């Protein structure tokens, strides 16, 4: 967008006079204006480096996935869970094939659907009957349950109905109309002590429901009639809602009503994977499990991190020339082929990208705002040296963790510790304890009392001096940087 005005030239023109049939009778004298060519734009990007970075990034992310996939169904992290030890359940991988449309679930009911696809479709139909009945009980039954007393599965369905269907997708439940201080609203959102029926009935009585979104009746409807119409609308909507169906698939997998083996079979049947390889023969013969097949295919990038849209599924690489500041590579993964969106737009391709859970339209290199991690350590080093809290001759001892602040201690990536480190050693080893201690000293006063705001202001000062509070100036959409205002 930014460079378009530079590239774009000016059309030429000429005034002509024509008769009724369009025949040129006369060309206006001195009316001709020659076209003006647009200006050239010169990129600093190294094409080969850009391509290489994309490939390396994809391989690295795939490697992280493979290293963390475990043969488990679910995993729940808590506040004490070390992020570096969080596994990826293989059932999440199977579900991702459906959830991010790697597998075409619409083909399950096609005339030429395979036997495996038909079995999966039949399992979904049974599940739909079961869940629609349970949802209807919560909407219209006489024995409804408070949200907190529902099963985790039913809580997921009910939350989807309220948050996704009624609010995000249709706008029936109006965000602007809801009184967030209302006691019934709090009972639903915070205390979870009322049922779906109670909440929506109350919402109808308070005019939080926009009836024009689902009813074309011109007559006045009281709150009871509004709720009856709304309940019927919800049931009808869910019956054709693909996103809701995908939720059902998740629990079909967890209940082993459909299997990873079936989904891997469908990958071959739908042409996502090629049957012309050794893995297919081993899988077909029963010598290769569904999990091992997925690990093989992720490793070989026949199934990519972008397709699965698990965590992690994205990344970025920016390489600059330190001598000139020129950008040599600016890579966001996953990307897309923008040639298919120019001139004659490929609308099917656009829709696919727009629904892709790995968000390919979002440029991670220029728009993602996240903690910089170890790349910020040189800033801490500069601040420490400049403020005199460390010197070139000082040594800081790393025993594997930093525990001078309240709360959970911060572990170094080397749990056994690095021992005594100089500033050079601290940078070379990217030691968490060394730089935590440096930041801690930045927040101490003359008496040795620590103040976290003082430490933060010192770090912010040097981050700003180094220009980290400003955009880079790349000629593409770029998020404004935001230096943190609190300690992690």
Give the ranges of each region predicted by the language model.
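Conserved beta-strand/loop elements of the cytosolic catalytic core of P-type E1-E2 ATPases, chiefly
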Residues: 39-49
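Intrinsically disordered, low-complexity regulatory segments
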Residues: 5-8, 49
């Amino acid at each position: 967008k930014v460079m378009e005005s530079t590239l774009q030239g000016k059309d030429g023109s000429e005034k002509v006079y024509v008769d009724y049939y369009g025949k040129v009778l006369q060309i206006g004298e001195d009316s001709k204006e020659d076209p003006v060519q647009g200006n050239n734009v010169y990129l600093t990007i190294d094409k080969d480096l850009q391509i290489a970075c994309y490939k390396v990034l994809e391989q690295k992310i795939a490697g992280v996935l493979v290293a963390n996939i475990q043969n488990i169904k679910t995993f729940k992290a808590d506040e004490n869970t070390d992020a570096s030890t969080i596994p990826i359940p293989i059932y999440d991988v199977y579900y991702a094939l459906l959830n991010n449309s790697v597998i075409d679930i619409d083909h399950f009911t096609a005339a030429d659907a395979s036997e495996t696809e038909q079995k999966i479709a039949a399992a979904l139909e049974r599940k739909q009957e079961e869940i629609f009945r349970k949802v209807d009980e919560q909407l219209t039954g006489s024995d409804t349950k408070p949200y907190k007393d529902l099963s985790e599965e039913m809580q997921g369905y009910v939350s989807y109905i309220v948050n996704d269907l009624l609010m995000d997708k249709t706008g029936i439940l109006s965000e602007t109309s809801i009184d967030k201080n209302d006691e019934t609203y709090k009972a639903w959102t915070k205390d979870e002590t009322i049922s779906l029926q109670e909440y929506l009935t109350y919402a109808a009585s308070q005019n939080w429901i926009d009836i024009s979104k689902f009813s074309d009746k011109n007559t006045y409807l009281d709150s009871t009639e509004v709720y009856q119409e709304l309940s019927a609308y919800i049931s009808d909507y869910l019956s054709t809602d693909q996103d809701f169906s995908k939720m059902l698939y998740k629990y079909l997998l967890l209940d082993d009503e459909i299997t990873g083996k079936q989904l891997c079979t469908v990958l071959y049947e739908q042409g996502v994977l090629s049957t012309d390889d050794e893995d297919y023969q081993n899988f077909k013969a029963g010598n290769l499990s569904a999990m091992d097949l997925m690990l093989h295919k992720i490793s070989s990038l026949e199934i990519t991190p972008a397709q699965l849209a698990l965590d992690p599924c994205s990344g970025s690489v920016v390489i600059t020339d330190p001598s000139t500041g020129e950008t040599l590579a600016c890579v966001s993964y996953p990307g897309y082929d923008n040639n298919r969106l120019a001139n004659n737009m490929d609308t099917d391709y656009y829709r696919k990208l727009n629904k892709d859970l790995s968000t390919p339209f979002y440029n991670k290199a220029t728009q993602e705002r996240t903690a910089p991690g170890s790349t910020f350590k040189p800033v801490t080093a500069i601040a420490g040296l400049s403020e005199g809290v460390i010197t070139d001759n000082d040594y800081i001892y790393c025993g594997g963790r930093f525990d001078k602040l309240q709360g959970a201690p911060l572990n170094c990536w080397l749990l056994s510790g690095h021992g005594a480190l100089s500033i050079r050693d601290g940078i070379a080893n990217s030691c968490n304890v060394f730089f935590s201690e440096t930041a801690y000293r930045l927040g101490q006063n003359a008496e040795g009392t620590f103040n976290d705001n003082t430490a933060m202001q010192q770090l912010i000062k040097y981050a700003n001096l180094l220009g980290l509070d400003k955009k880079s100036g790349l000629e593409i959409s770029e998020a404004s940087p935001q230096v943190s205002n609190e300690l992690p």
